[in-house]
């Protein structure tokens, strides 16, 4: 017998919630419906104290006298007006502060306010349908297209929707129906009255308990009053969470955390309405594989050049310190952090109090594109919605922050599950033993302890040490906030803390590398290029000069494969040169000092240079192309076994990712895209089309360096044996950023390559 595909959402092994103060006197009216006690079960599991009355066992006056916190009226087996009269009467007299029905109550609400209920034109009894909803009221936090089980085939009609009601949920109608959607939920615009036309308590309805929980949180007779009371309750809960031994007395003033939380909820709700920013738009982008490549966050934390891992942070302001630096350039700061040894970089994306945005995250991700062993990117935000996780992933985040203090356990578990489903192991933030227990129980691999009290912003760096014994050995524990100097870190190293987050202190450090080394018990030095000897490229090489150039110590041998140029070689000659270069040994082999360290990040151009300087016993063969088709370039690379491809025309920069070997791209210093990371291994700065011997002004070269302090180049500017040393010396402090020199006409006599000039040029360049 085939296995069943039935998904059972019933609470067979329930985890009952503690008693809920807001639901201390729930009255459930049983309209002789068979599902009443299923509804009762869900209400009780969510912490409600429920009393059940048959509709003919209690009068309206008696019901009013009992002062229920909520009134739930069960499904009505028949929807004729005379059969729902008992259900309508309590609603009309506004006895309950938050009336709610599991199914037919939508019909009752329609009848009560003058609407019409009619057949839907399709048989729906007992069927499951994907539900679309507005995310408010009972649907807060409920995913879209959640499967729900229908009660019957009747529903309120669109044309008779009372003015005082709004549609809160729908399901798709039949393709041949006159309407596109069947109404599945309605809500009173002013009063706290909600109704649905399906079974939240059904085993086939997903997130039914969440809907019940949302309902039981509702207070007050109007939505305005409910919002006020909920905000006060949330602020009180957050304040109470900071005390492990006593309840914090409730106050009317909201905490800073609550203010930020409320502001972000409202802002995200509005953002989700914008075309291109809607949840469906983000999901479509993710399904189209538009999220950038990611790395494993826990593993990156373990790969540190220090005794523990450094977590850096980019933020322009904070609630505790105010404005830090509004002029901070997030992508530039990220490159500094990465090369200084930071393993993750935390990017604040909250705009109001931290002056960040999701665009900061996207720009930072682009700035470290192509870095070898790049740091992981953390989206630091007040995460409360799956939408924010997907938004962060699409912007390039490798991980996200989730704060236990802000989230109920079920929502927290759901957010962790979604984060895992998109390949991101989150950083779970806690501050006390209760929160740590939750994080450990949910299996968090990386737990951060916030040393800062989020209510009064006081810092106690001992908070992390007090909680470390609760953390499983395989879990990485991070100390967050309040770390300013080496003494703050010493105890963490001794106790086995895996990482520390340093924010303002690092951003304000005058010498970042020195500060980090002293803070984390270095030593650590940023990987830099050696200025002693640039690599040498001989271009326009013909057969007779190839072997001589290699034997002289040249590192790169360039052959011109673009048609119509005076140094272009034939296919036969190109094959001959390829064979000679691949067989001829270099006189001296030295290991590059630029080879990437697996525990540190290196700029893309440092990595590009290391690929050209890696330990190898022969020179590398470079094929030079100009404005030829990509197909031709790929074919020649394969036929000639080219080690490197040089694009010397107007070829798109993106081609570099389509060529299976390192690519050099020629630029004029005024061109755009010279410093674009992730494509060409190194840019070649040249004055003209190549081989012209035209001088390239050093001021232009320096200007290119000034625009991008991480750019490294190959210099080709009319060099020759007599001027290569003086030219490089003329670059002053930028000398180290010339990784290679390229010569063509400078080693020729009467249009022919001179073997003596080749030897002289290599000797002069290697003598630097």
From Swiss-Prot:
Record pathway: Amino-acid biosynthesis; L-tryptophan biosynthesis; L-tryptophan from chorismate: step 1/5; Amino-acid biosynthesis; L-tryptophan biosynthesis; L-tryptophan from chorismate: step 3/5; Amino-acid biosynthesis; L-tryptophan biosynthesis; L-tryptophan from chorismate: step 4/5
> One GO BP annotation here?
L-tryptophan biosynthetic process
Chain intervals for the UniProt region annotation (N-(5'-phosphoribosyl)anthranilate isomerase): 535-768
Q: Where is the active site?
A: 103 (nucleophile), 199 (for gatase activity), 201 (for gatase activity)
Ranges for region Indole-3-glycerol phosphate synthase: 256-520
Query: Which Enzyme Commission number(s) are listed?
Result: 4.1.3.27, 4.1.1.48, 5.3.1.24
Q: Which InterPro entries match?
A: Aldolase_TIM, Anthranilate_synth_II, Class_I_gatase-like, GATASE, Indole-3-glycerol_P_synth, Indole-3-glycerol_P_synth_dom, Indole-3-GlycerolPSynthase_CS, PRAI_dom
Please give one Gene Ontology molecular function term for this protein: indole-3-glycerol-phosphate synthase activity
The highest taxon in the source lineage is: Eukaryota
Instruction: Enumerate the spans annotated as Glutamine amidotransferase type-1 domain.
Output: 25-225
- HAMAP family registered for this protein in UniProt: PRAI
UniProt function note: Trifunctional enzyme bearing the Gln amidotransferase (GATase) domain of anthranilate synthase, indole-glycerolphosphate synthase, and phosphoribosylanthranilate isomerase activities.
Q: What is this protein's name?
A: Multifunctional tryptophan biosynthesis protein
Instruction: Name the source organism.
Output: Cochliobolus heterostrophus
Quick one: which gene encodes this? TRP1
